């Protein structure tokens, strides 16, 4: 974001729309390359990571961590769409509306889900709220033909396949490995290699 915002603002000012779109596409590509493995990796190693990092008595986090990891992609997509594109192109009102909508959804869902599901409800509400904000921004840039969102998602397909393969391999190894720093290190290395 820090690198892209001034560059996109300059290209927008100079009316270099095509070059601006290319940079944004590269940012989306980066989101997929980094975000999918992080999300899938956290989901896959949670059962080993929690006891090693937190110790015993924190089993609830084994469920919360994978739930929260689902927000990695919407947060990253919102960053590219909102911070790196909408704000530098003087569409702050759309960005603000998406953030406000996300906040309203989060508060509303929290009021229903926390009393019933406690921390699981809070985690789920946060993920849903992030998705709502992301969807609002993405729909806006697609409807206004500012970014080719179909292309954004089509470039992600191979990364999703690789991420799912990595998840499955690490999850199977997670069942075999012992819960130790060495076991966790092995799982992380395995995921990195895949």
Regions found by a protein language model. Name each.
Residues 1, 13, 32, 54, ...:
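Hydrophobic alpha-helix feature that most strongly marks membrane-spanning transmembrane helices
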Residues 9, 46, 50, 87, ...:
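Membrane-water interface at transmembrane helix exits
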Residues 4, 38-44, 81, 114-121, ...:
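Juxtamembrane/interfacial segments around transmembrane helices
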Residues 1-100:
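Specific pore-lining/lateral-gate transmembrane helices of multi-pass inner-membrane transport
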